């Protein structure tokens, strides 16, 4: 029967600085590189080959309390190239670039704890075929109020709006 021969290389970098500059508690940075390939083999022949190379980076800034609000804000960027070849290939080669801004804040008001979050994503997918390229945005946000009305008891109200951008395979 068919089987898969897979190879993956991944490199990660993570760093954190305490009190990097005035007004901020922490600066966190992450970066990664992934090189992935798998062959779908039937008998002794590779029928389809998937190759994917990608980079991702993220920077977060944790700020000191500001009007009693505490939180983190950040940016994230990624790039991925996907190439599928062979007799049974169903995906066109493509490149995806994605950029994001995000933030999470929280504050205590007596017995109430308020949490707010937001994220804005921009994504562009260039497809090497007659398929139309994709260029779009997604905006998500959430809010929560937690009421500690009695020791060991909490009542929460949570609301959110989530948007998701398509993966290149979904186009």
Place the predicted regions along the sequence by residue.
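A flexible loop/linker signature enriched in serine peptidases of the S9 family
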Residues: 162-164
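Face-selective signature of the C-terminal outer-membrane beta-barrel domain
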Residues: 5-148, 153-154, 158-160
């Amino acid at each position: 029967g068919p089987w898969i021969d897979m190879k993956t290389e991944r490199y990660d970098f993570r760093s954190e600085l305490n009190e990097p500059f005035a007004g901020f508690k922490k600066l966190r940075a992450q970066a990664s590189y992934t090189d992935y390939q798998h062959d779908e083999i039937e008998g002794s022949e590779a029928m389809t080959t998937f190759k994917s190379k990608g980079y991702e980076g993220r920077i977060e800034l944790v700020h000191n309390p500001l009007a009693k609000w505490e939180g983190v804000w950040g940016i994230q960027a990624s790039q991925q190239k996907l190439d599928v070849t062979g007799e049974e290939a169903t995906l066109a080669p493509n490149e995806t670039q994605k950029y994001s801004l995000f933030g999470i804040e929280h504050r205590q008001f007596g017995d109430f704890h308020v949490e707010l979050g937001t994220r804005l994503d921009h994504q562009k997918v260039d497809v090497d075929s007659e398929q139309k390229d994709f260029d779009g945005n997604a905006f998500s946000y959430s809010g929560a109020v937690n009421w500690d009305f009695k020791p060991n008891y909490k009542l929460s109200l949570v609301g959110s709006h989530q948007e998701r951008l398509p993966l290149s395979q979904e186009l």
